[in-house]
Regions:
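Conserved catalytic-core segments centered on acid/base and nucleophilic motifs
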Residues: 34-37, 41-44, 314, 318-320, ...
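Acidic/histidine-rich catalytic neighborhood of metal-dependent amide-processing enzymes
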Residues: 44-55, 342-345, 408
């Protein structure tokens, strides 16, 4: 085959991630097959097939991904939960999730050694039966592939005992432990039992060499940069300072513009854009659903993909970005933790990728401070500490825009980057605009920007603040401190990754490396003072670079503690001691 016409094989296993990449690849590359191997360890759970069911419903014409279920009766350390299923049950399970063409090859049907149990070891068959079983697998694979590439959704299921041909059988075959060395009898016996002649090994090598038409680096479409639709100048709208605007809505307008310019662009969200003040996205790009309904902005050709499973939302968006497409995942912060591991998988892969690919972008709204209800389910800003820890990876950037202007600057900046993971955290409530567009862009590019500084005063109190809503009590505290004769500087920490020292971050180890860090002179101009107080509506992790570098002799942090059911943002801030009075008192004590 010609170069760049093959898909890439991916693995789902119990981790339940591989299917997202297969679906993303199939969506970006019609006519190219994307197989994905899946172990049966998770098949008794809804994890893997749940996401595929939603995809099959949303994209009924995209069939060019092929799940390959390795049904061997065991998980990692126990029997698989579907170990007792019959072949008919397993076939029905897949058909119930939209896979009408089930190709199931059961090794037991070829067994001539009278093995016990539903799962048998094909490597102990006679040579003729081994060839027959192998031939059946190859024939089923070819048929399944042809179906998948011709618009008929298919799955290939290979059923045989786990550990066939290796050192142990069942779940015990899953891992190699310290005792499993070449000196161990069970290892050496296994190698002798399955030894091949030199000619047979050469045949294996030849098959691998020729598979797919050549080396994957030359033939796999995912090894090449995907040509993207050009984007026009974004319709950035500069709001006047002190004007009250909704950051999420301002962001949504830019997302809508990107989708209108790029037909392959996909927005993923767990059915909550409108509740997050981003109805403008649904209105412009439409929710993808087989039922046309203008009341809900839904159409079969929509660009807004809305499974309720956050893992499926993040999975498709991350897979599209990794494979070269544009996407954005929009989430309630409260349930995002269910999906973040696949984002970490993708950002790690992007760090090692041999080509450029658009950065993975996500935005979290309905944050803890404004989601007062159900404190035990809807207030989980602790995930921001996860983002903060990943800043040291070298290619992960949590962004904390301070207003509706800066969130536009944040997305504008993100769209111009490659091989990075970018999480934007913002509010869905009307909040004061505190930056010009020039200041907003400066804060994102350099890492921080001054929002306010007293014209006069005695000792200086610096507030280093992440986010937008947390600024409300900070500006109130400023009035109290100025009345007491102090000078106050309020700094928006918008892109804390840029505030680290170069040696703090593994930036030089990643693809598309970024060594832009704020120098000491600019940092000190922002954060020097008699007292520095870090303030955040979330956890304290994102403020680490400021606390590491500040020369202020007295410093403190006022951050999120825990959620509680309240009626207003002010009440939840008071519950967490994030009030103007508390901030002014803390500063006064530090000054004393």
């Amino acid at each position: 085959p010609d170069a760049a016409d093959e898909g890439i094989g991916v693995i789902a296993r119990q981790a339940g991630q591989g299917q997202h990449f297969a679906m993303a690849g199939a969506l970006l590359h019609p006519g190219v097959l994307f197989p994905v191997t899946i172990g049966d360890g998770g098949m008794g759970e809804p994890y893997v097939l749940n996401s595929m069911m939603h995809f099959n419903t949303a994209y009924p014409g995209v069939t060019n991904y092929l799940p390959v279920l390795i049904w061997n009766g065991y998980s990692q350390e126990h029997h698989a939960m579907c170990a007792t299923w019959s072949n008919d049950q397993m076939s029905a399970y897949w058909k119930g999730h939209g896979f009408d063409n089930v190709f199931l090859v059961d090794a037991r049907q070829f067994d001539d050694k009278d093995q016990e149990g539903a799962y048998v070891d094909s490597t102990v068959f006679s040579f003729d039966r081994r060839l027959a079983f192998t031939g059946a697998v190859l024939q089923a694979a070819e048929s399944a592939a042809r179906h998948a590439l011709s618009g008929r959704r298919a799955v290939l299921i290979v059923k045989q005992l786990k550990g066939a041909g290796v050192h142990k059988l069942g779940a015990k075959a899953h891992n190699l432990y310290p005792a499993d060395t070449l000196d161990a009898e069970h290892i050496s016996d296994g190698l002798k039992r399955r030894a091949l002649s030199p000619d047979a090994w050469q045949l294996v090598r030849d098959n691998f060499f020729r598979a797919g038409g050549g080396p994957a680096a030359k033939t796999a479409v995912t090894e090449h940069v995907l040509e993207l639709a050009p984007l026009p100048k974004l319709p950035v709208r500069e709001f006047a300072k002190a004007e009250s605007q909704v950051p999420a809505t301002a962001f949504g307008a830019l997302v809508a513009a990107v989708g209108q310019a790029d037909p392959r662009f996909v927005v993923t969200n767990a059915d909550g854009n409108e509740a997050s003040a981003m109805a403008n996205i649904n209105q412009a790009l439409k929710i993808r659903h087989p039922v046309e309904d203008p009341l809900y902005n839904q159409t079969p050709a929509g660009q807004v993909y809305e499974p309720l499973n956050e893992d499926a939302c993040a999975g498709l968006a991350a897979g599209l970005a990794l494979f070269g497409g544009r996407s954005v995942w929009l989430s309630y912060e409260s349930f995002a933790i269910n999906a973040w591991p696949i984002v970490q998988t993708v950002t790690q892969a992007m760090a090692e990728l041999r080509r450029k690919t658009p950065s993975f972008v996500c935005m979290f709204t309905a944050g803890a401070l404004e989601q007062g209800r159900n404190g035990w389910t809807h207030q989980r800003p602790e995930i921001e500490n996860y983002f903060a820890a990943q800043m040291r990876n070298g290619n992960v950037y949590p962004l904390f825009p301070c207003d509706a202007n800066q969130i536009q600057a944040a997305y504008e900046w993100a769209l111009g980057t490659y091989n990075k993971g970018i999480a934007i955290i913002a509010s869905k409530s009307p909040l004061p605009v505190r930056t010009s567009m020039e200041e907003a862009r400066t804060g994102i590019e350099r890492g921080a920007v001054t929002l306010y500084e007293s014209p006069a005063g005695g000792k200086t109190v610096v507030f280093a603040v992440t986010g937008d809503m947390a600024l409300l009590p900070v500006f109130e505290a400023k009035d109290k401190l100025e009345a007491a004769g102090h000078r106050v500087r309020i700094v928006s920490v918008a892109n804390p990754r840029r505030l680290y020292r170069p040696g703090d971050v593994a930036w030089e180890t990643v693809s598309e490396p970024d060594n832009a860090f704020m120098d000491d002179d600019h940092f000190n101009a922002l954060f020097d003072g008699d007292v520095l107080i870090g303030v955040t509506g979330g956890p304290s992790g994102p403020l680490e670079p400021v606390l590491l570098r500040t020369r202020a002799l007295r410093r403190d942090v006022m951050a999120w503690k825990r959620g509680e059911t309240t009626a207003t943002p002010g009440e939840i801030m008071a519950f967490n001691d994030l009030t103007a009075e508390a901030m002014a008192n803390r500063a006064s004590k530090l000054l004393a």
